[in-house]
Amino acid sequence: MSDDIKKYLDGLLQKVSGLYVIQITDRDGVPLLRVSQEKNVDFALMPSFIPTFTTACDQASKLGLGRNKTIISMYSNYQVVQMNKLPLILTFVGAENCNTGHILALEHQVDGYLEDIKQAVTEA
């Protein structure tokens, strides 16, 4: 199943112009799956980067505007879109001019593939 998911995510990576990395981690930032283009985007793998998203989501939820599902940010010359799919965090890293709407549209396309990973993480 892991190869199917990886192949599917790699296909999505090719569909969105300027998208460099799709990474799935658990809530603590432990990488579970990663697909990337040739361009090296190391900052997305930094151990503190993903848990910072989790903390930011928790804090944003306290604003009284409802549950936070997505955070879009800029880092250097990169655009980072992180989605809260508890117990998973889905991270997309693209060029600063990458179409954010295209990245956000991928959310519903990957939901079906995430179910098996969610179940494995929950059982572990």
Swiss-Prot record:
SMART domains: MAPKK1_Int. InterPro entries: LAMTOR3. One of its GO terms (cellular component) is Ragulator complex. It comes from the Eukaryota. GO terms for biological process: cellular response to amino acid stimulus; positive regulation of TOR signaling; positive regulation of TORC1 signaling; protein localization. Pfam families: MAPKK1_Int. Regulator of the TOR pathway, a signaling cascade that promotes cell growth in response to growth factors, energy levels, and amino acids. As part of the Ragulator complex, may activate the TOR signaling cascade in response to amino acids. Belongs to the LAMTOR3 family. Part of the Ragulator complex composed of Lamtor3, Lamtor2, CG14184, CG14812, and Lamtor4. This is Ragulator complex protein LAMTOR3 homolog. It comes from Drosophila melanogaster (Fruit fly). The lineage of its organism: Eukaryota, Metazoa, Ecdysozoa, Arthropoda, Hexapoda. The gene is Lamtor3.
